[in-house]
């Protein structure tokens, strides 16, 4: 027993000693490379899509730019790798990307079986259905016997089966490998309905030949907590990815914006002072400079600003805040205290 305890103690000591060096691996690699490798969508309006000049925009894209701003004080130091639903986890597991921010649903199997950690939920979503108005359908419960276009390898495909089985309805699943293929098939008339996350329905509807001819049905059939993912084994990197989101949400709560962040440096509010690095050394605890959150807000803005310009009232999608509003206004976005 004594020999066992000594051996266990030595093993624990070795693990503790090795821990910090391993924990810094991703951050060190990102700094040495000079840019963040971000896994993004292949093209989803409002979340991750390149414009005509190849510049990436979207809510998820700005999450990655915020990470780069925190590290480099430069939101442009990001390489975006477009990934399909089928390839996204492999790319993260293999080290091709440092972080995956690609409207990905956090589920138990993904969290416990893929060697990944999921960060804060940057968009609370739920699965819905898009149909043609001429189908004269006002509820998903009227879709019995319908053909439904769905993307392969997604929680969407599984939820679709669950919903129709639970409601004792028949349907034909028409499956495609990519989001673009799925949308094009629906637009061409291959299917009666198209299903994905509700945010995606509003985004993809913009791509249709006649967007006004299609409606999103009222039913939300699932919970889709969307957020970033990182590999297991690097707690410091996981902390960085988490706290970037919390900083943006906290900034919105305290009224700190891209426009007033310099003025807010003079605030007497201790929470704002800690957020912006004017008090305490919280940046150092995650391997960053103490003005890491100031950098994020100066370059990107707070969570509300990012939401509004990408998917909210200031965007073509015009999605209401809903569950993604601040906790003080009936939403679920809630910043962990910096103290």
Describe the role of every protein-language-model region.
Residues 37-46, 56-71, 105, 125-181:
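Bilobed "Venus flytrap"/periplasmic-binding protein-like clamshell domains
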Residues 62-65, 69-71, 134-137, 141, ...:
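Extended ligand-binding regions for polar small-molecule ligands
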Residues 31-32, 68-73, 93-97, 134, ...:
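Sec-exported extracytoplasmic/periplasmic mature domains
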Residues 23-101, 288, 303, 326, ...:
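Extracytoplasmic small-molecule ligand-binding "clamshell" domains
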């Amino acid at each position: 027993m004594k020999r066992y305890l000594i051996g266990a103690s030595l093993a624990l000591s070795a693990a503790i000693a090795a821990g910090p060096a391993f924990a810094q691996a991703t951050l060190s690699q990102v700094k040495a490379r000079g840019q963040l490798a971000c896994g993004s969508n292949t093209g989803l309006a409002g979340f991750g899509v390149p414009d005509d000049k190849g510049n990436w925009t979207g809510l998820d894209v700005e999450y990655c730019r915020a990470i780069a701003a925190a590290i480099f004080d430069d939101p442009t130091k990001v390489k975006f790798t477009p990934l399909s639903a089928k390839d996204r986890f492999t790319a993260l597991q293999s080290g091709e990307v440092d972080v995956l921010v690609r409207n990905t649903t956090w589920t138990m199997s993904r969290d416990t079986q893929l060697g990944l950690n999921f960060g804060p939920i940057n968009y609370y979503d739920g699965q819905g259905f898009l149909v043609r108005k001429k189908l004269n359908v006002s509820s998903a419960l009227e879709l019995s016997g319908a053909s439904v276009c769905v993307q392969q390898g997604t929680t969407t495909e599984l939820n679709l089966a669950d919903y129709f089985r639970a409601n004792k309805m028949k349907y034909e699943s028409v499956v495609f490998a990519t989001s673009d293929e799925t949308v094009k098939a629906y637009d061409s008339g291959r299917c009666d309905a198209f299903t994905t996350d509700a945010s995606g329905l509003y985004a993809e509807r913009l791509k249709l030949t006649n967007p006004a001819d299609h409606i999103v049905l009222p039913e939300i059939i699932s919970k889709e907590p969307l957020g970033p993912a990182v590999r297991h084994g690097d707690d410091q990197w996981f902390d960085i990815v988490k706290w970037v989101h919390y900083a943006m949400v906290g900034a919105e709560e305290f009224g700190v914006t891209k426009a007033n962040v310099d003025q807010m440096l003079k605030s007497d509010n201790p929470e704002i002072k800690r957020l912006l690095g004017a008090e305490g050394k919280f940046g150092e605890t995650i391997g960053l400079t103490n003005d890491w959150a100031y950098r994020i807000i100066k370059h990107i803005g707070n969570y509300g600003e990012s939401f509004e310009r990408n998917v909210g009232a200031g965007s073509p999608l015009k999605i209401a805040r809903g569950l993604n509003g601040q906790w003080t206004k009936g939403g679920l976005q809630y910043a962990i205290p910096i103290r």
